[in-house]
Amino acid sequence: IGYVWPEPNSSAAGSHIMSIMRLFLSQNWQVEFCTPCSISEHMIDLHQEGISSTSIELNSDTFDTYIKNYNPDIVMFDRFMMEEQFGHRVEDNCPRALKILDTEDLQCLRNARYRALKENREMSKADLFSDLTKREIAAILRCDISLIISSYEMNLLIDTFKIDKSILHYLPFMVDLEKYPKQNKPFDQREHFMTIGNFRHAPNWDVVLYLQKIWPLIRKELPRAQLHIYGSYPPPKATALNNPKTGFLIKGWVQNAHTVMEESRLCLAPIRFGAGIKGKLLDAMITQTPSITTTIGAEGMCTDIEQWPGVITDDMEEFAKNAISLYKDEDKWIEKQKNCKNLIESIYDSKILGKELISKILEVEQNIESHRLENFTGAMLKHHTMTSTKYMSQWIAAKNMNKNI
């Protein structure tokens, strides 16, 4: 059950959900994708992938009929909002179905960091323990398995929110090493800087605005260099920033991120807030393009910061200085580039990650009753006294029905 139609060429989230569905298909499982979202411009052709699809309605009993007739063994929710909307209907009509929550990233963490950034201070516990957090954690507890994309978020859920790790499963981006390019363009065949990201995603828009401040420092030392900014759905406020005179270029949507990434010498990702792990930085590793990023940008993506294929810094002037240095120094660039392959192979191998996920699903499915008995808090949250979202949905459905009479 998707939040939006998958757009693997527009967002890392779209790419991630497609890799999970392809994994399910490889097990000879029948996969259907449904969403209440309207058709989008860059959505993938699911039929071509061997995945059936249908549109569903929010707050409508038509979903009950649909899910009852389909009678799935497994239901995966794409982000916690979909579990809030449809989880109780799945529970009522298919109580035995294994419920998986694909968190994509912890929205509550991203929201808490954004609040702190706006007020120019460190994130506090009060920021983190918001109403949004309570909703997201409740959704995690109501599901049988929640997929967590970042090792940092795994630790946060276990240590801070005291969630039993038996209902969590670590699943970063999955990279098919057999399709991993054996060779990429060398240093002297690459030029310019680049960044990429869906403009509708708030942390990506913040990156563009922050790069506006950093770019003059870089351009001063490298007057012929350009910064190419790619991403889907650029709004007028973004295209208005396009400035050929200063080399600050808003390029917009691109069919293949890897093609433009491989032509660039460096990927710049000064990410100041967000959560999960960053698709642009994984793409940089795949194309063996060194990157300059922040602590939050690299968070959960490697175990040792010394092994980062580039530089990690939170200081604006240091960011610019390192970008200039790495852009000019071929030996240093090659040294950092070597870390790309090592990181991909040690953390993001789709064969290993896929095998572990299928193993977890089958294990829980075979022991579903005992697994649920161990999750008393989740059972309590599903109890009728706490299902406010269910009754709100039923009220809206009844109200809509009366409108149509």
Could you tell me what each predicted segment is?
Residues 339-405:
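C-terminal amphipathic helix plus adjacent low-complexity
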Residues 280-283, 290-294:
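Short hydrophobic beta-strand element within catalytic cores of glycosyltransferases
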Residues 141-159, 163-180:
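Donor nucleotide-sugar binding/catalytic pocket of nucleotide-sugar-dependent glycosyltransferases
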Residues 72, 144, 262-276, 287-289:
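Acidic donor-binding loop of glycosyltransferase active sites
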Residues 1-43:
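N-terminal subdomain of nucleotide-sugar transferases
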Residues 309-317, 325-330:
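Conserved acidic donor-binding segment of nucleotide-sugar-dependent glycosyltransferases
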Residues 3-7, 96-97, 101-130:
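Acceptor-binding helix/loop patch of EC 2.4 sugar-transfer enzymes
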Residues 18, 33, 159, 169-262:
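Conserved catalytic-core segment of nucleotide-activated headgroup transferases in glycan assembly
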